[in-house]
């Protein structure tokens, strides 16, 4: 849940054209980990209501699942960063609750908290459960399944990406694909 676009030295700040998944070192490293078989889940960033607006590295990396934030009613959190990448890929990939997320404080009291740093681990936990149920999938297959199971999968955009993932739909889709493959 780490991303940035501005530096102490403004000459090093990222520009939109840098968001190609290859320019930023952290994006290249996230993509490398994904290529080795890890599921990398990144927060989209909280720059949506500022002048930058765009997803921050490493959320622009290829083969990572970048998560934006919505409220519990499915409405975009105004701070959630948007895409797309400079090379035209859809980002964020999916959305999860990040506005009014229920989190437990160090004092043991549950409170609401805001940020894609909350939507990302929520999605990460759901993806981990899905992978546990479908251990034969590769990381890339799993991420593609999560995208295809979003409520906007038929028309992804640069704000919601593929939308809110229905993990039961993802599981059922995987089982159907497996049955189709086994039946051939």
Protein language model regions, located:
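Subtilisin-like serine protease catalytic core
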Residues: 1, 9, 35-37, 60-63, ...
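Substrate-binding/access-modulating region of protease and related hydrolase catalytic domains
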Residues: 1-60, 89, 106-114, 118-120, ...
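Structural recognition of the beta-strand scaffold that forms the well-ordered cores
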Residues: 1-2, 32-34, 39-43, 65-68, ...
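Solvent-exposed loop/turn segments at secondary-structure junctions
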Residues: 4-7, 46-50, 71-74, 85, ...
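Secreted peptidase-domain scaffold signal
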Residues: 45, 169-184
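Hydrolase catalytic cores
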Residues: 54, 98-160, 164, 168, ...
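Structural recognition of alpha->loop->beta junctions
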Residues: 56-72
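Internal glycine-rich alpha/beta core junctions
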Residues: 80-100
């Amino acid at each position: 849940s780490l991303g940035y676009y501005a530096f102490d030295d403004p000459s090093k700040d990222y520009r939109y054209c840098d968001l190609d998944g290859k320019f930023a070192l952290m994006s290249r490293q996230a993509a490398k980990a994904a290529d080795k078989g890890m599921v990398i889940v990144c927060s989209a960033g909280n720059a949506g209501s500022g002048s930058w607006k765009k997803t921050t590295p490493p959320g622009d990396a290829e083969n990572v699942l970048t998560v934006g934030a919505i409220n519990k009613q499915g409405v975009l959190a105004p701070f959630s960063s948007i895409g797309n990448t400079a090379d035209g890929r859809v980002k964020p990939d999916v959305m999860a609750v990040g506005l009014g997320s229920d989190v437990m404080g160090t004092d043991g009291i549950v409170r609401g908290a805001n940020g894609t740093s909350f939507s990302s681990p929520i999605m990460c936990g759901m993806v981990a459960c899905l992978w546990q149920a479908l251990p034969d999938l590769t990381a890339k297959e799993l991420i593609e399944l999560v995208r295809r199971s979003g409520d906007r999968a038929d028309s992804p955009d640069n704000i919601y990406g593929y939308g809110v993932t229905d993990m039961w739909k993802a599981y059922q889709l995987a089982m159907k694909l497996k049955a189709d493959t086994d039946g051939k």
